[in-house]
């Protein structure tokens, strides 16, 4: 491959995807969001695989990355629907924590401009050591921050998909031309 523009761009996109996924992973860990943590972990592994395939001219690894991007886009569309409460989904359920805790998005209490204070729990609720928290003054609501994260992931995945298909095409064309010589 004399000109590496496609490969170099795919390497850049994969690196950017890795950085964005690591940032998202940190905030999902802070919020104990186990489903996104698992998804981000798998995504990071597959992006590393795609990066390796791109650097080492291994089209099968790039194909695996390409297939994964379709699943990753679907997962992020689900997250957008979840936080925007589309189709009967509710951001107030414990779905993202696999129903094992009452934690929510870290951004719910720590978003830009958010001020939170503890509110006494009603006597009818037995929350153990948990308490109610009142959050006010947020510049942007937490669900929109989560939607922006997912939208960025979708955008990077779609761009990565296009470049991965291009790089696969170029690599296989080069392999075919080498076989016919």
Swiss-Prot record:
Residue stretches spanning the membrane: 5-22, 35-55, 62-82, 151-171
Recorded superkingdom: Eukaryota
Disulfide partners: none
One Pfam assignment: NKAIN
InterPro entries per UniProt: Na/K-Atpase_Interacting
Bilayer topology annotation: Multi-pass membrane protein
Main location: membrane
Compartment(s) of residence: Cell membrane
Keywords: Cell membrane, Membrane, Transmembrane, Transmembrane helix
Entry GO terms, CC: plasma membrane
Protein family according to the UniProt entry: Belongs to the NKAIN family.
Quaternary state and interactors: Interacts with atp1b1 C-terminus.
Protein name: Sodium/potassium-transporting ATPase subunit beta-1-interacting protein 3
Species this chain originates from: Xenopus tropicalis (Western clawed frog)
Gene (name only): nkain3
């Amino acid at each position: 491959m004399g000109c590496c523009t496609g490969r170099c761009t795919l390497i850049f996109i994969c690196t950017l995807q890795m950085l964005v996924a690591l940032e998202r992973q940190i905030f999902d860990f802070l919020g104990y969001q186990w489903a996104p943590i698992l998804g981000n972990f798998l995504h990071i592994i597959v992006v590393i695989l795609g990066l390796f395939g791109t650097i080492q001219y291994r089209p099968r690894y790039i194909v695996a990355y390409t297939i994964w991007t379709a699943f990753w886009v679907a997962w992020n569309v689900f997250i957008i629907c979840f936080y925007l409460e589309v189709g009967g989904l509710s951001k107030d359920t414990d779905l993202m924590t696999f129903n094992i805790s009452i934690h929510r998005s870290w951004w719910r209490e720590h978003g830009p401009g958010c001020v939170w204070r503890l509110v006494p729990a009603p006597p009818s609720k037995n929350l153990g050591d948990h308490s109610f928290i009142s959050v006010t003054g947020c510049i942007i609501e937490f669900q929109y921050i989560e939607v922006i994260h997912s939208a960025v992931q979708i955008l990077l995945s779609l761009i990565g998909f296009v470049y991965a298909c291009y790089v696969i095409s170029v690599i296989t064309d080069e392999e075919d031309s080498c076989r016919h010589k």
